[in-house]
């Protein structure tokens, strides 16, 4: 079983889509999308393989959010043509966190009546995807630890996700502006997932955002024998080719047995 987490930066490569307006370059974005899909096709082949992608574009961005312009279906159709299915969250936003699974044969499903659907504040819900097999995955894109931690508290030990993975925006930043201050806050909240809720980060602390040189993407597991004994391999794929497809590297976890 392979589980991947990767922030794909709206198929804008290494460009800062918010500042550079690279979203306008359709041909460039299609090239990036096809390269990312080609990479995922090689990894997601078994029924229990899954990739959680952050910053998957839902609405167009042209200096401001174009709420009436849904570009999501254009991108998901590219995945479908390559025998991959995109599972979307309940609530939409400019960018969403999605899961990608093998078309027609996946054992993963979006949870019914999930906690994300009912508990997260507007504006944050679109950054989560919750999946269920024999265990639960929560794919996230923070900042919104102030929402995530109370949710975990309300769930109780038995109902908390077995895996929490994604872009935590929790790197060790040098504080230069208010954005860095917010991310330092995220770092503090991230530590509570480890120290208070007992999760173990197996991502190894390597650089995942190669622009800032920070470790901001993480892969957390419940500290149980079930997972610790079945982890076969964990690595950040920092292949030079991938450094042109996004400002983030993917984290790949391989589990020894099927659940």
Give the location of each predicted region.
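Soluble or luminal CAZymes and related metallo-dependent hydrolases
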Residues: 24-39, 67-71, 119-123, 143-153, ...
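Active-site metal-binding loops of divalent metal-dependent hydrolases
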Residues: 6-8, 56, 142, 167-168, ...
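His/acidic metal-ligating clusters that form di-metal
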Residues: 133-136, 148-170
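Structured beta-strand-rich core segments of catalytic domains in phosphoester-bond hydrolases
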Residues: 50, 54-135, 142
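Surface-exposed cleft-lining segments at the edges of enzyme active sites
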Residues: 18-27, 114-118, 135-148, 172-178
């Amino acid at each position: 079983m392979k589980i991947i987490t990767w922030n794909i930066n709206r198929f804008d490569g290494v460009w800062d889509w918010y500042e550079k307006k690279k979203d306008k370059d359709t041909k460039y974005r299609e090239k990036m999308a096809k390269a990312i899909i080609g990479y995922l096709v090689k990894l997601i082949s078994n029924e229990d393989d899954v990739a959680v992608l952050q910053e998957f574009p839902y609405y167009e961005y042209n200096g401001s959010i174009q709420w009436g312009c849904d570009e999501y279906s254009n991108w998901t159709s590219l995945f479908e043509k390559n025998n991959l299915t995109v599972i979307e969250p309940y609530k939409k936003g400019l960018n969403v966190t999605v899961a990608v699974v093998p078309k027609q044969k996946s054992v993963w499903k979006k949870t019914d009546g999930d906690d994300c659907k009912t508990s997260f504040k507007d504006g944050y819900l679109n950054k989560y995807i919750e999946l269920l097999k024999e265990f639960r995955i929560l794919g996230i894109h923070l900042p919104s630890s102030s929402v995530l931690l109370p949710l975990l508290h309300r769930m109780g030990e038995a109902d908390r996700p077995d895996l929490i993975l994604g872009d935590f925006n929790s790197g060790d930043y040098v504080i230069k502006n208010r954005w860095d201050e917010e991310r330092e806050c995220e770092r503090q909240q991230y530590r509570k997932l480890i120290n208070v809720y007992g999760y173990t980060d197996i991502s190894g602390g390597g650089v995942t955002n190669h622009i800032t040189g920070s470790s901001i993407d993480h892969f957390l597991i419940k500290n149980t024998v079930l997972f610790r004994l079945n982890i076969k391999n964990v690595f950040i794929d920092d292949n030079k080719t991938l450094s042109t497809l996004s400002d983030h590297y993917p984290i790949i976890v391989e589990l020894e047995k099927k659940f």
